[in-house]
Curated annotation (Swiss-Prot):
Organism: Bacillus subtilis (strain 168)
Xref: NCBIfam families: PRK08064.1
Protein's UniProt name: Cystathionine beta-lyase MetC
Subunit note: Homotetramer.
E.C. code: 4.4.1.13
Localization per record: Cytoplasm
Length: 390
């Protein structure tokens, strides 16, 4: 088998930077230099100042480009730095369509920052192709997708939205944080820019803040690099190295966590104290078939709704294994409360319209044994009086 046909899990370990050419070290060197000596007065080398690029950052950027099937990758200081830099492609008077139940940080960026610069926005149900089509305006320049969405796991038909975008001269951005290239490759489906909070599954250990982007079109890549260099929200070399290390185990971590997530979703679905479960791996999820057509797995994030905020509080106080925290995608399971965590920036009325109620919890499943997690939730849910009988 040629290296071009290697499976993803092999590519993750055996990337082009797996050994250092000068020393043979089985690790990417961390180049802490902020500036680089130029041996020629007339012709500079590949690196001059670390904001513009470093060998360590190049290793990460080329790796994410290859994993996503792109021509160019970009490493940023956070997921929101990646998203914000991509939005710099917009100009005053432009309009952007955004998934209605988008991540709270993106919601804040769109509603509180882009509006100050005269950039219009419309939140739409991206699962409804007709609504997307009706919402496109003459000045719409970007359609921004999350699929699955955060935190209600809505599924967008990527190809359908890409087709609408191309018919109307729009760029498409897609936040691929939940899926990663291990489960979904948006560039192959026609998306222009794929974005990641690499803080999450890509690094996978709750120990680094980082963002990544990848593009297939080389001209768009040049434009995005110019903005990355100008805006300057780039990833430091130590953090680049941590993400590169985390990537090596992405496939095994995600496979394990996804299997457990499926089991827990089915467990929650049957439990009388749980009103609703959001997970695309469930047969009755409205986007299940669409998701299967464009991805290779349901992922390791699910959300479930309890009767009230009081029920949520009781569960959180009685569960033992998951950490109660913001973020997701780590080796440890993370239980989050979107109303006061990921979507705290969203007004309550807007949250509730999107199904992000005071009873909603999001669970990022880690690599713990499935039996232990299920037993932990089972004992915690016993503290909550059943609200329905299935």
């Amino acid at each position: 088998m040629s290296k071009h046909n290697w499976t993803l899990e092999t590519q993750l370990v055996h990337n082009p930077f797996k050994t250092d050419g000068g020393t043979g070290a089985v690790s990417v060197p961390i180049q802490h230099a902020s500036t680089f000596h130029q041996s020629s007065f007339e012709e500079f080398g590949a690196y001059d100042y670390s904001r513009s690029g470093t060998p360590t950052r190049t290793a990460l950027e080329e790796t994410i480009a290859a994993l996503e099937g792109g021509t160019r990758g970009f490493a940023f200081s956070s997921g929101m730095a990646a998203i914000s830099t991509a939005f710099l492609l917009l100009s005053q008077g432009d309009h952007v369509l955004v998934t209605e139940d988008v991540y709270g940080g993106t919601f804040r960026m769109v509603t509180e920052v882009l509006t100050r610069f005269g950039i219009e926005h419309t939140f739409v149900d991206m699962t409804d192709r007709n609504e997307v089509a009706r919402s496109i305006k003459p000045n719409t320049k970007v359609i921004y997708m999350e699929t699955p969405s955060n935190p209600t796991l809505g599924i967008t038909d990527i190809k359908a939205v890409v087709q609408l975008a191309k018919e109307n001269g729009c760029l498409t951005f897609l936040d691929n944080t939940f899926m990663t290239p291990a489960l979904q490759r948006p560039l192959d489906l026609g998306v222009d820019i794929v974005l990641h909070s690499a803080t999450k599954f890509l690094s996978g250990h709750s120990d680094v803040l980082s963002g990544l982007a990848a593009v297939k079109d080389e001209e768009l890549g040049k434009q995005l690099y110019k903005l990355q260099n100008a805006f300057g929200a780039v990833l430091g070399v130590q953090d680049c190295w941590l993400v590169l290390r985390g990537l090596k185990t992405l496939q095994v971590r995600l496979e394990k966590a996804s299997q457990t997530a499926q089991r827990l979703a089915e467990f929650f679905q049957k439990h009388p104290a749980v009103k609703r479960v959001y997970y695309p791996g469930l047969a009755d999820h409205p986007g299940a078939e669409t998701h299967k057509s464009q991805s290779t797995g349901a992922g390791a994030v699910l959300s479930f709704e309890l009767e009230s905020k009081e029920a949520v509080k009781k569960l959180v106080e009685n569960v033992s294994l998951p950490v109660f925290a913001v973020s997701l995608g780590a080796v440890e399971s993370i239980l989050s409360y979107p109303a006061t965590m990921s979507h705290a920036a969203m007004p309550k009325e807007e949250r509730e319209k999107r199904g992000i109620t005071d009873g909603l919890l999001r669970l990022s499943v880690g690599v713990e044994h499935a039996d232990d997690l299920e037993h932990d939730f089972e004992q915690a849910l016993k503290e909550i009086a059943p609200v329905s009988v299935r």
